[in-house]
Regions:
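Conserved beta-strand scaffold positions in the cores of enzyme catalytic domains, especially
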Residues: 11-15, 225, 244-246
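Accessory nucleic acid-recognition modules appended to NTPase machines
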Residues: 75-214
């Protein structure tokens, strides 16, 4: 947020991600799964899958992780987990964003309204004019609020490959920051396809440059194309593309350029950017 530049003169600022699936398994199943690079996963995913599936029922744990595995405090009071998430969200929107962004506190209801609209539809391509009209704010205010929600780790605002980056630039696709937020904030039925995409984007964004692909779902590090889907996801959208992969849910093992979703980011590499 705006306060980061002032604080950075006096302290080192870290952005701490919630549990990766690897960390979740290590914590809950007392495993010691190592960190690997994305390249290692792409080159050796079958051998890695075999080694892990022999140790743990990954698909059951992965389903649980998507619902309540991102924030470590789930194990303290499982029945109150979503209530605690909502309390944290309210704290960020009602206190932290106004203080750190200089937003008038009377506008926090607008920010919260925007967040819940995103929760109902994410991931989606935003129509800035319609969104600003629906909430009753200007275009620039809407873009500033979207930027604040992204910096607060409540949303992920992604641009298409080849796009520039600006605080007042319309995001090409909006996501909630992680799948647990989807289950906590959405009052409607959760679409599993949206959950898969949100998980994939969340796990990559802290360590890799991630963009919306022109041909598929995601374009990573200016090189790799990924299409995310269920176990029967076909390769039509990546045919003819180099360094292109299917990331499929509900499978324990992959083959060739089809990788299990649970494995694709079970080993998160060290960050390559601040």
């Amino acid at each position: 947020l705006n306060a980061k530049s002032d604080l950075s003169r006096r302290a080192i600022v870290y952005e701490m991600q919630g549990f990766s699936f690897r960390e979740y398994l290590n914590w809950n199943e007392k495993l010691s799964l190592p960190i690997l690079t994305l390249n290692n996963i792409l080159d050796n995913h079958l051998a890695l899958s075999v080694g892990i599936v022999d140790k743990v029922k990954v698909l059951k744990h992965f389903s649980d992780y998507l619902k309540h595995g991102y924030y470590p405090y789930y194990n303290e009071l499982p029945a109150l987990y979503y209530s605690r998430i909502n309390e944290v969200v309210n704290l960020i929107v009602e206190l932290e964003i106004p203080q750190l962004r200089g937003v008038d506190i009377s506008y926090t209801t607008k920010i919260k309204q925007l967040l819940y609209i995103i929760a109902e539809s994410a991931p989606f391509i935003p129509n800035v004019s319609k969104l600003s009209e629906r909430i009753g704010i200007s275009r620039n205010s809407l873009l500033a609020y979207l930027d604040a929600l992204h910096d607060s780790c409540l949303t992920m605002n992604l641009q298409k490959e080849g796009s520039g980056i600006s605080r007042l630039q319309k995001p090409d696709k909006l996501f909630l920051e992680n799948p647990n937020l989807m289950y906590a904030l959405s009052a409607s039925q959760i679409d599993i396809g949206n959950v898969r995409e949100t998980f994939f984007a969340n796990q990559l964004r802290y360590c890799h440059k991630i963009n919306v692909s022109k041909e598929s779902d995601f374009f990573i590090d200016g090189r790799y194309t990924f299409e995310v889907g269920g176990r029967h996801k076909g390769k039509q959208q990546i045919n003819g593309l180099s360094d292109a992969y299917i990331v499929a849910d509900d499978i324990e093992y992959g083959i060739n350029n089809k990788i299990p979703l649970w494995l694709s980011l079970i080993h998160i590499s060290e960050p390559t950017r601040p």
